[in-house]
């Protein structure tokens, strides 16, 4: 997956709300590659809402990336 051309791009490129982006950055997740190493449950523990996690997951899939443990 690390060969994906989006792996080193910033999470800001995701079409998600500002609250979700702020939460990711507060947890020092700044790149899509870093984000893809997290599980949904870990994102929820950071304070992200389920609908925000679902949106993040869809956005990653559109770029050929997934969250850890996702198919």
Label the model's feature ranges.
Residues 1-71:
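Compact, charge-rich alpha-helical regulatory domains located at protein termini
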